[in-house]
């Protein structure tokens, strides 16, 4: 679907691209960076920087396009993925992050090395690199290539390569701090354009009352009956936590943002801030899809809901901002993935075989970023040949990767008795089981009707692996290092007590309880 752009729209896009590169080059020239600067932003990030950076990384093209599609076809039920996230952000802030900072880690695999030993560490290094390359980079480039080619009528692979080159350039130049600062800039663009689009669509419909009356009644139900084939309350309440624990508490691309916090307090408030932003996300991402259903239900496919609203409702000038928002969401997702891949590969792979000073690590990190971008283009090409939509691919990939990591990290943080051998059995054996199951699921083998919903599949795999780690733990003897975490760096602690943070989470919980009641 081609979107006709005027000169003013191209001017807006040009200003956006220039601003993006200015931020990257400016940060590179300001000062000589140390190892922590390029990989963890110098561990100086404040709560609002962390929150906006998490928002922009999370609000990728999948959210803008996928959530509008979900709103068009299903209604508010997709809001569950946003309005339940606060529980797992709370877990990250109050339970996982203190332990991560105490250990002084730079990457998530380093935590497993301290908790469960070298073999678990080796597994997660490889697993993290594969997950970043496939889930964050390959799928994002594929989705972004589809968007760019659809808007500008360019060939798909040319669009994918353009996105990869642009994101890799300012990521390699500026490191994590450039990713964070461009993330703040891009968060503002995404929120502003989404609010504008929502307001224009609501105005076109005739207001909130017209929207309520124009969509089917079940579009306003947040938790659907257990018999619902698509998004039953059982699938969401049981399956989403499996994915969310991995995504919010153990994924390198997400956790790296809070590891870069100035201190524990800033990291905790950053997680609280993004949890609060989650309240508005369905209003500006899912509700526009519902409005598109009212306006164009007989002529539009769900996957085209966002682009359709942009094409038909947004005037020139503002149209450039909305297209910039799509590109911003795409760029930040890709740049976050590139920086995370570079961090893990440089610090957990290259540093094991070669002694490097900060300057050497920085040079290596830049080259790894460029190499990761090239590999991701190849993965995106394979996705383009798979015959499946990018939304289906991303859902399947996350549900495959989540169960073993969710089990091992929960045990590692909350169960001191869990042993190294039990973690290794779940990671290596469970990882192979999940990957094999996921491949069969994606290929619909032995048949499409054989497989449950992808969230329920995650639950079943999680329960099997949870039982496995318990059984192996009780039949194996703990090693001397099991459960020990030796701090590697001095981490600044927040002054005073933790009650202000807990008060913030309590207020948020009450607000979310009211929202659940409203859409029950």
Predicted regions and their residues:
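Membrane-embedded helix-loop-helix hairpins and adjacent transmembrane boundary segments
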Residues: 1-520
